[in-house]
Amino acid sequence: MAIELRECAGIAQFNTGSSKCLLDPGKVKAIILTMHGYKLPANATAELLEAACHDDRPNRIFPIKTIIEYAPSGGEANKNATGYGPNKITSYSAKDDVWTVDEYDASLKANIMAAKGVAFDAYFVDENNVVYGINDGTDILAGIPLAGIYPGGQDWDSSGTEANLTVGTMFKDYEKYVKNADYRVYKFDVVEALKGLVYVELVKQDTGENNYKLKEHFGNLDVTSFFGAALSEGASSCFDGEVSAVKFENGNLVITATGTPSLKSPKVLQENGVVGIEQWKA
């Protein structure tokens, strides 16, 4: 009769050797957020990552860049002794790291604040095009589950410090992450390929029957000149609202339509050469 034997869980899969070529972790330059359970594209290329940034939800990835400072916090062993016995590890403290972004961005801060209840997965990208995640037993690198993200930093300049933005990442289970940590190394500029989206609005002008401006939702910045040429080339491919013609002239988008024009999805825009924007919907 077969006898089932128990293995010691602590050392059943335990070794202390080193890789023939140890990875030298670089400075993290970007964070990629995904909806929980969703992953980066398999066999990722720069083109696939850019497309994923513009994909329809929930497949879309959400990059935050460029990171210029890292302040780790937590993830330390919690120890406790019973009576006069030795200390034993009972658990690990919550891991709550803070990342500083290179420029203060009120729009990004507002978006992160609004997502306080969302449990994202996260990938971290370093300066050497290494993407860090976890091994979930499949061939595709998975993101690190987070309990949440939050913004911080300083909203205005002071005598010694300029306004700055930080992003906090709260690990859902730091011990599980360390046990399953993994990474992929790419041969293209991962950070450059990442294109976060900005909310914009199409605003009809009083001057000219068909004149429109494109403005950022947060801050009302006129960005017509940045996207006007590409949107006019895409014409009806970039717009809903039964648009028949689009011209970019004198700083305006001149849109001929029988309905109310609005931008198509970021996925469609990106396929037509318009990168980095999404129509704001109240």
Roles of regions detected by a PLM:
Residues 101, 124, 168, 210-216, ...:
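Generic recognition of long tandem-repeat/solenoid scaffolds
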Residues 106-111, 126-136, 220-225, 260-265, ...:
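Short, surface-exposed beta-strand/loop "edge" segments at domain boundaries and coil↔beta transitions
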Residues 165-171:
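C-terminal edge-of-domain segments
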Residues 204-226:
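Beta-strand-rich structural segments
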Residues 43-154, 160-163, 174-190:
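Extracellular/virion structural assembly segments
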Residues 188-210:
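Beta-strand-rich domain onsets/edges
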Residues 1-65:
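Polar/acidic, low-complexity leader/linker segments enriched in S/T/G and N/D
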Residues 225-282:
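The feature marks long extracellular or luminal low-complexity segments
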